[in-house]
Each structure stands twice: as structure tokens, then as C-alpha cells.
Amino acid sequence: MSDFADMEALAGALLRRVDAGERGKILRVMARTLRSSQSARIARQQDPDGQPFAARKAQPPGRLRRGGTIKRKAMFRKLRNTSNLKAGSTDTEAWVGFSGRAARIARVHQEGLEDAPAKGAKPVRYARRVLLGDTEAERQALLDILFAQLVKA
């Protein structure tokens, strides 16, 4: 086992000893922090491993196309808003995920699936862009938060 796995096991054991109300507060802080870091990483257009997202496919030129201003902007600008990227917790778990229609869009990109870009359009295979995932830095930050909150409690 790595040192990190040992620390996670210790953190889990310590967290189970805290009463449910306090544990819920700690997990809520952890979920919000994780949501914030996931949102920032999506804004940087990076996968959890640090690689940039796969670029958009080039569109064929046409006379009905606009100047391409939308395509030059960052992908997933609205997906990372708090209205779409949700964080929550109970007294036993903390979670971060997408809600509603955004969840469907995110799933297609997360797994590199095929989807129709518009109603009645031919399905297109999207490149795999990992929107949600943990990094070593995020895991370390969550452990730091957990230990800081346990010291306060």
C-alpha cells in the first residue's frame, strides 16, 4: 500500500468516529471544494491527468456559417456553472455531478459516445474528454480539509 492509501484508510476510520451531523458538515465542505476544483480544471480545458481536451472537429466552410466565434471559445463554459455542476453530501457520502440536460451532454463527452448534435441530425461520435475525475492534488487537498475539520471538531 502507498502512503496515500494508508492516509485515506486512516481518514475513513477517523470520519466514521465523528457523529452524523458533524460528518455531514465535513463532507459538505469537501464536496464544495471538489466541485470548485473540478470547475476550475474544466475551465483550463484539461483532463484529470493534465492533458488538454481533444480539440473540436473542424467544420467545413459554408456560406451560412457565422464567423466561427462560438467555436473559438472554450468548451463546456456553461457546464461548469453551479446550476449544472452540482455538489452535495449526506452524512455518509459526498458527491459532485451534473444535473438535468447537462448530465446527458457531459456523459457523452466523458465516455466518448455517439450523439446527435441537433434534433434530426446524424449522430456524431464525440472525442473522449474526461470532465469529472480526481487528481492527486485534489485528493491531497480533500485529506487536508478532512484533517483540518477533524481538528476543529
Tell what function each PLM region has:
Residues 1-153:
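Short, Lys/Arg-rich flexible segments
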